[in-house]
């Protein structure tokens, strides 16, 4: 939450930059929709941005890659209860071309999947950085424990 009666996007951007300051961030991958405040703050801080739309053609490969990392025991979330809850709120949507993306399950649309969506976004950025799926990322979830085979 932010102080006041409305969401303070500059406050949120400032908090994000404070967290990112604890890590060696080379680039931030963001959804361009409604990102003006974040984009401005990150540019001022000198953090390069890679914008990509949250559509199935962009999200299919990183969703498949995150699934591969989890099922292959190459990545886990350290039994984080919030991420466990968010995973339980996810379903996989598949289009007629076999592209996939995560969606909220229909049982309760109010439940959150933001942490899982952020993980897919991070995998997208990681794949862009190494230019191919496969392997094991150094880290893409704060506090996550990565297991290498």
Which residue ranges define each predicted feature?
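Short, charged, surface-exposed secondary-structure boundary motifs
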Residues: 58-66
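Active-site proximal helix-loop segment of RNase H-like, two-metal nucleases, encompassing DDE(D)
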Residues: 65-74
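RNase H-like, metal-dependent nuclease domains and their acidic two-metal-ion catalytic environment used
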Residues: 1-54, 64, 77-149
